[in-house]
Amino acid sequence: IEEDLIEEVIRVIGFDKLPLSAPLAPVSARVRPEAQRGSHALRRAVAALDYQETINFSFVEERWEAELAGNLEPIRLLNPIAAPLSVMRSSLLGSLVQVLRHNLARRATRVRVFELGRVFRRDASVQTSEQTVVGIDQPLKVAGLAWGPVEPLQWGARERAVDFFDVKADVEALLAPRVATFVAAEHPAMHPGRCARVELDGRTVGFVGELHPRWKQGYELPAGQGAPVLFELDVPALLARPVPAYQPVARQQAVNRDIALIVGEAAGHDAVIGSLLAADTGGLLRSARLFDVYRPAPGAAGFQPGER
């Protein structure tokens, strides 16, 4: 490496011949843009949501890649440090599931962990540079796993297991003040009916969902307790944040109104709220929030023609 070559040259010339005064050079401070936060700030934000950071090997078991990442052609190591750790990871989720298993073997009753690191995927468009290798994409990801009670042991509330919506709220907090859209989706590691794709400005930035029942059983997790909930997000999407812009306070007092809509069962939350916000209200509508859902009782006749 460069430093070793410099050391050898100095040894030949003689250390006693080096000038005693430090070299002078102009120094210019590098100021991070206000609309960008660093990875350490992101780590602190995840830790503030009650997750503990873990650091795992970048080489993992081939089984994890096939089952939890759907990657049947992972990048193989020519000289792995151990026979099971034979491929490079393309997802952080396998390592977090293994961390959960490690803690459960030591009788942990509540586990909330995360990792921020690089994953490795084949990409023919990547060229060799100072930080890249030809054909290999190395994006930064952050992933988290929550299992067990929502709150630590305490007396003020009944114990409740963490669920999809708890972790979804954590993802929303990490992306705030930007508002994400959650679209029902499928992921190799996650429950097909309890998984969502996270989108920002129409672009997919990650996934959140419960661990698939098949993998919960396959990785020997407790059967009588809830499934762990996981998320994995692109780090660049989390580092960007809009700069607050001043808006004058309205001279007129805000008015709240309730509105009832009749929609089909297939209509989701985002479709309902999106249609309201897209309506031509002349700038009078600032926000909309869904607070109640009513469904007729099973067997009821429903709405009559004159009741709509």
Indicate residue ranges for each PLM-predicted region.
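Residues forming anionic-ligand binding surfaces in small-molecule and nucleic-acid pockets
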Residues: 12-28, 73-78, 119-158, 248-258, ...
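Glycine-centered flexibility sites
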Residues: 14, 50, 117, 148, ...
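A general structural signal for short secondary-structure junctions and capping/turn motifs
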Residues: 44, 48, 84-85, 103-107, ...
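A carboxyl-terminal module marker
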Residues: 56, 63, 137-138, 143, ...
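Active-site loop ensemble at the mouth of alpha/beta enzyme cores that anchors a bound cofactor
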Residues: 69-81, 85, 133, 206-217, ...
